[in-house]
A protein has these predicted regions:
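Conserved small/polar residues in nucleotide/adenosyl-binding loops
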Residues: 338-347
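Glycine-rich, proline-tolerant flexible connector loops at the mouths of alpha/beta enzymes
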Residues: 50-68, 232-238, 298-304
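Alpha-helix-loop-beta-strand connector modules within alpha/beta enzyme cores
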Residues: 64-84, 125-130, 186-194, 245-260
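Catalytic alpha/beta core domains of metabolic enzymes, predominantly
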Residues: 129-230
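Catalytic beta/alpha-barrel core
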Residues: 84-91, 104-116, 132-141, 164
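N-terminal amphipathic alpha-helix/helix-capping segment at the start of soluble metabolic enzymes
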Residues: 1-22
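N-terminal active-site wall of soluble small-molecule enzyme domains
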Residues: 56-103, 116-117
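Active-site-adjacent beta->alpha loops and helix N-cap segments on the catalytic face
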Residues: 61-71, 111-127, 142-148, 178-183, ...
Length: 350
């Protein structure tokens, strides 16, 4: 599905330039906290305020949001600051309550976008409603599932749609809370070029010191906007305190961003080169991981007096990867060469 008639997420009074910025606390905690954050962000010329009213937590027992009462606080934000307000919805009831309260923009979280049943319920609840809706990527790196979630909303008649890249869960321990895997949103942009694409550096990084570099990387990749968690006293936040920044820090970060024009004639070449660089980074990380596992296998063989080279297993690897290469349109000889080089040292022979 091409979705050629998607519309920009433009709200009156917001300049149509990059980056579109949505900011506010992870959670609406108290009326005073919400209003303080909104006033501080409005003073920094942020136009769209975000706050979680319902918080889907990974485990029970954590703060799960203030619920409907928080929508009244968002109404006060609109009335007192003139900002647009946004929140996350995960059920039909959430949609009903948010629309009734006059929320201007909705987003759908990673746990919800991963569930086709939940997405269909939300699509039904939003049918006939003209409101911007942003869809976060599913928790797992599944581009088709992400596109499918967007398609369900599109099929319900929504045209002001966008996507939020918030990274992907992984068992591997790295500096990120959620792995960026930039090639996935890049492929989403290639498949749906008219779909606005925002980055959530707070959830990707999981640490406030990573928000600025991740935001710059998103701008370098041509993302249209940022959704950032900002709290007046982040160390006292009731949820995700490590990944929130103060409004002043956010303002400084936004002013130091380098936003390059995407209409330059060299932009396609630069974007392709950036894609190659990031794919190379991921390939090297995967190769390093594979080598670590290979060394563990080699050590096991040594401890159990097993031969380092097991020809049958080695032939199986080369034959299987060669067949996969053909299916993917890759020269199988290049794959064989890569495997031979990867197994040059005895401990790498798996």
């Amino acid at each position: 599905m091409e979705m050629n008639d998607l519309q920009p997420i433009i709200l009156p009074g917001i300049p149509a330039r990059r980056p579109l910025v949505i900011a506010g606390p992870c959670s609406a905690e108290t009326e005073e906290q919400v209003l303080a954050a909104a006033r501080a962000l409005a003073a920094q010329e942020v136009k769209i305020f975000r706050a979680g009213i319902w918080k889907p937590r990974t485990k029970p027992g954590g703060f799960e949001g203030v619920g409907v009462e928080g929508l009244r606080w968002l109404q006060r934000v609109k009335a007192e600051t003139g900002m647009y307000v946004s929140t996350e919805v995960a059920t039909e009831r959430h949609v009903f309550e948010a629309l009734k309260a006059g929320v201007d923009l909705l987003w759908i979280g990673a746990r919800t976008s991963a569930n086709p049943f939940a997405m269909q319920e939300l699509a039904g609840a939003l049918r006939g409603v003209d409101i911007p809706v942003l869809v976060k990527n599913p928790v797992n790196p599944d581009l088709e599932l992400w596109i499918g979630a967007i398609e369900r909303l599109y099929n319900a008649g929504l045209r002001r749609l966008g996507a939020i890249h918030r990274g992907f869960s992984s068992y591997d321990r790295t500096i990120y809370r959620n792995q960026p895997q930039w090639h996935i949103p890049i492929e989403l942009r290639r498949r749906l070029p008219q779909l606005p694409l925002l980055c959530d550096p707070s959830h990707i990084g999981g640490k406030r010191e990573l928000i600025a570099p991740l935001s710059q990387e998103a701008m370098d990749l041509g993302f249209d906007g940022l959704i950032v968690e900002s709290h007046c006293t982040p160390d006292e936040a009731w949820s995700d305190k490590q990944q929130q920044v103060t409004p002043d820090v956010l303002c400084f970060m936004l002013h130091t961003l380098v936003v390059r024009e995407t209409t330059q004639t060299t932009e396609p070449l630069a974007e392709l080169r950036q894609q190659i660089d990031r794919l190379d980074d991921e390939l090297l990380a995967l190769m390093a991981k594979r080598m670590r596992i290979s060394r563990e296998i080699g050590q096991y063989k040594k401890e159990h007096s097993m031969p380092i080279l097991q020809a049958k297993r080695y032939d199986e690897i080369l034959n299987k990867r060669g067949a996969q290469a053909v299916e993917l349109g890759i020269n199988p000889e290049s794959v064989s060469y890569t495997h031979l080089r990867a197994h040059e040292t005895p401990e790498q022979l798996v």
